Amino acid sequence: MQTIEQQITNVIEKSLTDMGFELVLIKFKGVNHKVVEILIDSLNGEKISVADCTKASSTISAILDVEDLIEDAYSLEVASSGLERPLVKFENYNRFLGREVKVKLKELLNGKTRYQGKIIKAENNKVYLKCEAQEVLIDYDLIKNANLVLTEEVLKKLLGSVKVSN
């Protein structure tokens, strides 16, 4: 049986993709899980705007109203996945090659459950990280969660793309 998050993914993902968005994560939060938070990113690498979130929210809300998957009253929040976005699909690691990532594992690997390093490659269900002076090979199935890290390099690129008007 599918979780409610998987059921919601099944009914909204294609519409979001058609709109140019990637569905990053669905989670329930708040008291009694009455808030449905949906994180999105753009498929073309553009920044997500408030208008994008509003447009996605309207579409998702309409779909969820028709599908009636959530029994009780809830609030819907649609937001950008952010600069330190979670990596929740194996394909995300290839999309963000060369980027710094923090990874938390389900069990020990070389005596550690946490790693931080640059993504070197991702293939055959394995993620290769450059952590300080060593390479670490992590089986994707061992990853509990992972997030991009906002580094000085990324920040400089972002600030370099900001146009300042006088």
UniProtKB/Swiss-Prot annotation:
CDD domains: YlxS_C. It is found in: Cytoplasm. Pfam families: DUF150_C, RimP_N. The keyword Membrane does not apply. Keywords: Cytoplasm, Ribosome biogenesis. Gene3D superfamilies: Ribosome maturation factor RimP, C-terminal domain, RimP-like superfamily, N-terminal. The keyword S-adenosyl-L-methionine does not apply. GO terms for cellular component: cytosol. InterPro entries: Ribosome_maturation_RimP, RimP_C, RimP_C_sf, RimP_N, RimP_N_sf. GO terms for biological process: ribosomal small subunit assembly; translation. NCBIfam families: PRK00092.4-3. Belongs to the RimP family. This is Ribosome maturation factor RimP.
